[in-house]
Amino acid sequence: MPETCPNTVTKMRCAVVTGGNKGIGFEICKQLSSSGIMVVLTCRDVTRGLEAVEKLKNSNHENVVFHQLDVTDPITTMSSLADFIKARFGKLDILVNNAGVAGFSVDADRFKAMISDIGEDSEEVVKIYEKPEAQELMSETYELAEECLKINYYGVKSVTEVLLPLLQLSDSPRIVNVSSSTGSLKYVSNETALEILGDGDALTEERIDMVVNMLLKDFKENLIETNGWPSFGAAYTTSKACLNAYTRVLAKKIPKFQVNCVCPGLVKTEMNYGIGNYTADEGAKHVVRIALFPDDGPSGFFYDCSELSAF
């Protein structure tokens, strides 16, 4: 990994982006770099991460480095990342928690054929996930749900907790959690989960964890529909609803920080099979805008693209 002069770097703001090797994460890295910020691009796969950094450097984004990070591995890669940032940059100014998974598997060939039949550029294609015939091509299991919560919710918590001491050294620390409008409370259909997540004054990490445990228990016992969870995308919806709730808790806990969550929109990425209303570049702009709010900017809010939204 190429060295950077420490004296130069410490004068720059420093950002960590999780899941930065492709899609929205890659574009977030590019845009933060263009804003004069030193970017640590992280992802699980070393080869893909190094290739992403090389691609950015080849397009004149020199202030980007790679460090491996598995958001489900707090002992090894997270600790190593924290040590790297402390030694190299002395502090951390911006954390963008972007890494995430869908929580279900797809019969890819048949799904792509369905997209082709509808028309990739058709206005109708963005509604494909609502179609029962499309949902029949998708499978949700306990194992996939567990992975989804482990990455989308617990992964964010773990990364944030490990990097918090470095963020506290910043004059203007920011945490941006990349969420989804799918995680809005209006889509949380389990009554107990809605009651817990909707009570902002009583929210705690422990209460949010209760919702996660309830969901996983119902997945294991095949009681998802019986107990009123969403019939499709229950793990993803719940993971993002819990992420939004965690954002609120964290913002109250550390008022010196700007802590916000944002839905970048339905973005045309590999995870979405190219379906969306926005390009990855456009989706990333919604995230970067919040990461670069003025020092007196808001905290504890949810943004749907560029608009302030109710949780």
Curated annotation (Swiss-Prot):
Reported impact of R48E: 30-fold decrease in affinity towards NADPH. 1.5-fold increase in affinity towards NADH
Species per Swiss-Prot/TrEMBL record: Papaver bracteatum (Great scarlet poppy)
Effect of substituting M271A: Almost 11-fold decrease in substrate affinity and 2200-fold decrease in catalytic efficiency but no substrate inhibition
Protein name in the entry: Salutaridine reductase
Active-site residues annotated for this sequence: Y236 (proton acceptor)
pH-activity note: Optimum pH is 6 for the reverse reaction (reduction) with activity decreasing sharply towards pH 4.5 and pH 7.5. Optimum pH is 9.5 for the forward reaction (oxidation) with greatly reduced activity at pH 6.
Consequence of changing N272A: Almost 43-fold decrease in substrate affinity and 3300-fold decrease in catalytic efficiency but no substrate inhibition
Stated consequence of mutating N152A: 6-fold decrease in catalytic efficiency
EC number per UniProt: 1.1.1.248
Similarity comment: family membership: Belongs to the short-chain dehydrogenases/reductases (SDR) family.
Activity regulation statement: Subject to substrate inhibition at salutaridine concentrations higher than 20 to 30 uM.
Result of changing I275A: 15-fold decrease in substrate affinity. Almost 7-fold decrease in catalytic efficiency and strongly reduced substrate inhibition
Pfam families: adh_short (PF00106), adh_short_C2 (PF13561)
Keyword check for Nucleus: no
Molecular function as annotated in GO: salutaridine reductase (NADPH) activity
Catalysed conversion reaction: (7S)-salutaridinol + NADP(+) = salutaridine + NADPH + H(+)
GO cellular component: membrane
Outcome recorded upon mutating R44E: More than 50-fold decrease in affinity towards NADPH
Binding of substrate, residues: S180
Record-linked CDD domains: carb_red_PTCR-like_SDR_c (cd05324)
InterPro entries xref list: CBR1-like (IPR045313), NAD(P)-bd_dom_sf (IPR036291), SDR_fam (IPR002347)
Impact reported for S180A: 3-fold decrease in substrate affinity. More than 2300-fold decrease in catalytic efficiency
